[in-house]
């Protein structure tokens, strides 16, 4: 969005989908997560402030769930302090059973570990054990499988032997992946069946890892002081809470899941155990809640359809980058979002107050509006998340509004139906001058380059890529051209600046904000690991930015005047008109005085000539 720098300044914001593609995803991911985490914490604060929390005092007490979520424990609101029922360092054992029922444990023991201690000793980190077993017809036909984790400790002082039970599903049901496209030029065989896609059809996926943790926490909680975010995980009995068994799926990505069908003959699972602290556990579950909320709002990508979610990309970024890069990325992403907002705000302000199209390229604005429409259709055809789709649709409406400010739109309505019969786009009077002449000239030269590129990329895509339909081919070919060559569509504005020898008509405040974001994008293009060609694609739009800077240098703007389209600019314009009017009146007065003087001289010369003639006659 920002790589075009000042070029985009006069013509609106670049689509968000293109921003995510050009930045390799990292800037878009972090910016998106920052917004959603802010929304999440604001909403949490509002609910806790005005609606109360789940652990407020009430006459009926607080209901807490235990680890397996099957029973509840009611704790009176005036209960004593809650302490851990397991002392530090006590030995325990852990067993994992597999069962097709979430209620019956059965006798299928697959993992067992003795003499574990409830503390931070290194001996509590158990190496991964791989278990492989044959699949059954039940599992191959969307059957379920559960892991029953049973943790037991010996009797301690006056406390009896304790046993914890956690049930964890190993099968998850997700929508069936969408079928891939086809080569539209290949002839379809008559014997080949027609594949129909049902978005409501679910298939089973196998979780190949089971990471077990026992949360080490010896905090003594005063009454009603357990954080509401974790209160549902506690199992409390007689003023004591039991340790929490945590099945960690935070690092389980969508791509790790294995589909289970008739062709799968064996399944394997890796089981490991280690201790985990309360802070780390809370951090993981809070972050996972934020990511889940983002996906529920439609901002998680197409993970259910087979693609990687934004949450998975964010987690992968945490593991693949150094901490200092993550910290720098977070700070710069916040600045990036602020500059983006300021650029958008000032861009809207400029076009709202702009009264003249002199020096501005209407063709470039029209092209940008068409590009935004193409990208919106492409995102709609690919069933992109609602968040990205709404952002792109809003951007298209903004560009159409700017087109309405640049031109006069005349709508003729039908007499029988409330539908438009004809829509006319009429250029404004200020534009019908040298600006339009230069704009048409630049568009003619640009079309010589643009049309062959569109045709060439479309033919290449038709031969070598797969598409769902002919409509998808047309839209994807157009959007590929937009993503690849959109930067050259700003050349008409450069051409107009060159011909008019002026850049004062451009919104330079918007230009500066987007220029800062351009530097940020270029910085991350070299910090973040990505292919060389992708880095060059991030730098190519800087050509337009550099040309704009050069034009700004050779065509300086009077700093005492505002050319931003604001109220100050209108006052300056009115003052200029007043000064010009006064100068014109002065010149007219001077002309009148000169004419009167000439008339007087003519009259004097005429009278003197008459006197001379009279004297001559007398002589």
UniProtKB/Swiss-Prot annotation:
Skewed-composition ranges (Acidic residues): 591-605
Principal place of residence: membrane
Annotated localization: Membrane
The UniProt record lists the keyword Membrane: yes
Keyword field: Membrane, Transmembrane, Transmembrane helix
Deleted gene: phenotype: No visible phenotype.
Membrane topology, as annotated: Multi-pass membrane protein
TM spans (from-to): 26-46, 324-344, 360-380, 384-404, 445-465, 474-496
Keyword Transmembrane helix set for record: yes
Sequence ranges of Low complexity compositional bias: 9-21
Short name of any one Pfam family annotated for the protein: CLPTM1
Basic and acidic residues bias (residue ranges): 574-590
Region (Disordered), start-end ranges: 1-21, 566-619
Recorded family membership: Belongs to the CLPTM1 family.
Name of the protein in question: CLPTM1-like membrane protein cnrB
Species whose genome carries this gene: Dictyostelium discoideum
The encoding gene: cnrB
């Amino acid at each position: 969005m920002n790589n075009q720098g000042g070029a985009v300044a006069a013509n609106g914001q670049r689509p968000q989908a293109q921003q995510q593609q050009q930045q390799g995803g990292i800037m878009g991911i972090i910016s998106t997560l920052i917004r959603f985490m802010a929304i999440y914490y604001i909403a949490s604060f509002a609910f806790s402030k005005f609606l109360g929390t789940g652990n407020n005092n009430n006459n009926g007490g607080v209901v807490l769930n235990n680890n397996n979520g099957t029973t509840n424990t009611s704790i009176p609101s005036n209960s004593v302090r809650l302490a851990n029922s397991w002392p530090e360092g006590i030995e325990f054992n852990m067993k994992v059973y597999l069962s097709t029922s979430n209620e019956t444990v059965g006798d299928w023991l697959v993992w067992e570990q003795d003499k574990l201690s409830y503390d931070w000793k290194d001996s509590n980190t158990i190496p991964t054990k791989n278990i492989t077993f044959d699949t059954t017809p039940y599992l191959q036909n969307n059957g379920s499988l559960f892991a029953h984790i049973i943790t037991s400790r010996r009797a301690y002082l006056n406390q009896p032997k304790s046993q914890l039970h956690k049930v964890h599903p190993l099968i998850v049901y997700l929508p069936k992946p969408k079928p891939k496209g086809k080569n539209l030029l290949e002839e379809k065989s008559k014997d080949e069946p027609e594949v129909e896609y049902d978005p409501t059809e679910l298939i089973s996926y196998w979780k190949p890892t089971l990471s077990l943790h026992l949360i080490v926490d010896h905090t003594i909680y005063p009454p009603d002081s357990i954080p509401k975010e974790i209160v549902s995980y506690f199992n409390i009995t007689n003023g004591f809470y039991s340790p929490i068994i945590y099945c960690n799926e935070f690092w389980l990505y969508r791509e790790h899941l294995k589909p289970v069908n008739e062709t799968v003959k064996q399944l394997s699972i890796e089981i490991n155990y280690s201790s985990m602290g309360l802070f780390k556990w809370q951090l993981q579950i809070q972050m996972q809640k934020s990511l889940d909320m983002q996906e529920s709002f439609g901002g998680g990508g197409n993970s259910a359809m087979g693609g990687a979610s934004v949450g998975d990309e964010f987690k992968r970024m945490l593991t693949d980058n150094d901490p200092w890069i993550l910290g720098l990325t977070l700070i710069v992403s916040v600045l990036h979002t602020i500059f983006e907002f300021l650029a958008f705000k000032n861009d809207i302000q400029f076009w709202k107050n702009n009264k003249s199209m002199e020096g501005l390229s209407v063709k470039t604005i029209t092209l940008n509006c068409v590009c935004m429409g193409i990208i919106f259709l492409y995102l709609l055809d690919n069933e992109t998340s609602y968040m990205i789709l709404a952002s792109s649709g809003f951007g298209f409406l903004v560009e159409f509004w700017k087109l309405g400010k640049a031109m006069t739109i005349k709508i003729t309505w039908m007499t029988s139906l409330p539908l438009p019969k004809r829509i006319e786009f009429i250029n404004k009077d200020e534009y019908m001058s040298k600006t339009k002449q230069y704009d048409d000239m630049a568009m003619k030269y640009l079309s010589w380059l643009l049309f062959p590129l569109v045709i060439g990329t479309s033919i290449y895509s038709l031969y070598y890529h797969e598409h769902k339909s002919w409509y998808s081919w047309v839209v994807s070919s157009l959007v590929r051209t937009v993503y690849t060559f959109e930067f050259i569509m700003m050349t008409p504005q450069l051409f107009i600046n060159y011909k008019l020898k002026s850049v004062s008509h451009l919104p330079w405040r918007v230009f500066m904000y987007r220029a800062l974001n351009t530097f940020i994008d270029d910085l991350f293009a070299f910090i973040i690991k990505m292919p060389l060609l992708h880095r060059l694609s991030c730098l190519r739009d800087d050509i337009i930015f550099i040309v704009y800077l050069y034009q700004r240098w050779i065509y300086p703007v009077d700093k005492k005047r505002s050319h931003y389209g604001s109220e100050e600019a209108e006052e300056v314009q009115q003052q200029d008109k007043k000064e010009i009017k006064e100068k014109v009146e002065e010149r007219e007065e001077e002309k009148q005085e000169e004419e009167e003087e000439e008339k007087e001289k003519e009259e004097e010369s005429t009278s003197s000539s008459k006197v001379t003639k009279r004297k001559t006659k007398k002589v």
